[in-house]
């Protein structure tokens, strides 16, 4: 079974790791001074830090919509049998909830609430990518294992 690992852009993995493990990235929206920008496309983390350092207002995120997730998952499934997708903590964003709704509509998508962000998500994503490449677990088994592993990050 060909399993694709994907994550939202808050995983902060380097482009090299994303390419090496063929990780799909679903960008969140960054809201800066009332303007909605696509994370990693319209604005980078360095630009966010510079904006705040220069005295600009704090930026916030806006969740990926159910529609955007449906489109993203369908695209990922063009080259895979199943997708295991990691999200910023459900306590911080509606991304996980929206992805679960989209996953039910699309099928063969296994969302994981990382209950974390940045490096915490990134570590889970990399471990899942290695498990997927190994090919010995199903997508659901990877999802379950990562839900157990996330407890070690707290």
What does each model-found stretch correspond to?
Residues 76-82:
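Glycine-rich phosphate-binding loop signature in dinucleotide/nucleotide-binding domains
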Residues 121-133:
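Short, small-residue alpha-helix embedded
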């Amino acid at each position: 079974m060909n399993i694709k690992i994907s994550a939202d852009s808050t995983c902060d993995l380097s482009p090299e790791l994303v390419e090496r493990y063929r990780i799909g990235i679903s960008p969140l929206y960054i809201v800066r001074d009332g303007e909605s920008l696509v994370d990693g496309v319209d604005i980078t983390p360095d630009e966010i830090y510079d904006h705040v350092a220069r005295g600009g207002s704090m930026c916030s995120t806006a969740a990926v919509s159910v529609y955007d997730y449906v489109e993203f998952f369908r695209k990922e499934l063009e080259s895979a049998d199943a997708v295991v997708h990691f999200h910023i903590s459900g306590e911080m964003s509606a991304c996980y909830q929206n992805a679960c709704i989209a996953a039910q509509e699309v099928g063969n998508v296994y969302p994981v609430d990382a209950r974390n962000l940045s490096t915490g998500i990134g570590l889970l994503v990399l471990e899942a990518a290695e498990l997927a490449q190994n090919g010995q677990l199903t997508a659901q088994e990877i999802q379950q294992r990562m839900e157990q592993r996330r407890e070690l990050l707290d």
